[in-house]
Amino acid sequence: MDNRTIVILGITGSIGIQTVEVIQSLGNFHILGGTYHKNKDLADAISQKHNLSNLISTSRGYDLAIEMLEKLRPDITLVAIPGFSSLILALKAIEVSKRVLLASKEALVCGGWLIKEKLKNCETNLIPVDSEHTALMQIYEEPFEEVIITSSGGALRDWELHNLHNAKPKDVLKHPVWKMGERITVDSATMVNKAFEVFEASEYFNIPISKIRVLIHKEGIVHAGILLCDSTIKLHLGFADMKVPIAYALTYPERKYKKPSWPDLVNTNLSFENVDETRYPAFKLLYEISENYAKRTAYNASDEIAVQNFLEEKIKFTDIPKVIEKVVESTNGQVRDLKDLIQIDKESRKKALEVIRCL
């Protein structure tokens, strides 16, 4: 494989850091540049180690990041920044790169149809980085009856329902399987993250929401499954290690990453449970809003505001779904373009703060 150039949007985040480590292991990739938000010290350390001449802070907006992509036109762009802005950057990355690795869920949640329209006009491969979607990509086969996405259930999965309102950020951030950023770890506990992944799977593979089933799988070994028409079930198993899907996305369709160990099938029990929608009220909203990008954008924006306020201990954990539901209910209409989505995102954040003030 010839050396490929890459820009990492979100180089100081969990996915960004692990991507840098994977690239060090693989070789054959040259990091041209990256973005960071506020962690300048870590960004400078990465830049010095890898001799990056293009390092952009996004703390004041994303215009410079867009300019960097236009100037560098890397072979690969990794979009690994949280929030709605990932949609804007993903659209630009599709324009300028041959391959876009998408780790930011919000891009497809809020603007899936925009991403797919852009892909029609560009010779770009969009590759998922999420463990569930890269797993599904590897086992996908038609015709099928149903696909399965698994969920750990988050840090509070074994708490009594009547105690959930007492959960503090330190409790919620103790994820039982994965090591991730703060927002996504909270989203795992509410299963908002899994709702995002259902939307993503629908967009990536053009699957109706009704054919995507989520199961609680506490062991974190099975990442996805597919039920085929002849009663066969295919499952994808692997360690809870994001470096594996990152490496696969970088080298697809080849496997270049070496990790000579596998889950112990003899001494591991695999269990599956249906989702308790009483425990995860924000999750069940996905079925009501799946066809409405305005409400999906409101869902994302209100969640982001609610999670931040929970992490700052301004609201209770059980207030998060209440904020989301009220904002989504108050969001009406359809969207025509990116401008409409940006406006809804802005309005939804404002509404979320208003709801929080009234709790």
Curated annotation (Swiss-Prot):
Q: Which SUPFAM superfamilies match?
A: 1-deoxy-D-xylulose-5-phosphate reductoisomerase, C-terminal domain, Glyceraldehyde-3-phosphate dehydrogenase-like, C-terminal domain, NAD(P)-binding Rossmann-fold domains
Q: Name one GO molecular function term.
A: 1-deoxy-D-xylulose-5-phosphate reductoisomerase activity
- Please list the residues that bind 1-deoxy-D-xylulose 5-phosphate: K105, S131, E132, S152, H175, S188, N193, K194, E197
Q: Name one Pfam family in it.
A: DXPR_C
Alphabetized InterPro entries for the sequence = DXP_reductoisomerase (IPR003821), DXP_reductoisomerase_C (IPR013644), DXP_reductoisomerase_N (IPR013512), DXPR_C (IPR026877), DXPR_C_sf (IPR036169), NAD(P)-bd_dom_sf (IPR036291)
- Residues bound to NADPH are T12, G13, S14, I15, K38, N39, E106, G181
The entry's keywords: Isoprene biosynthesis, Manganese, Metal-binding, NADP, Oxidoreductase
* Annotated residues for binding of Mn(2+): D130, E132, E197
Is Cell wall biogenesis/degradation tagged as a keyword?
Answer: no
- Enzyme class, top EC level, equals oxidoreductase
Known role: Catalyzes the NADPH-dependent rearrangement and reduction of 1-deoxy-D-xylulose-5-phosphate (DXP) to 2-C-methyl-D-erythritol 4-phosphate (MEP).
**Protein name as annotated:** 1-deoxy-D-xylulose 5-phosphate reductoisomerase
**Originating organism:** Pseudothermotoga lettingae (strain ATCC BAA-301 / DSM 14385 / NBRC 107922 / TMO)
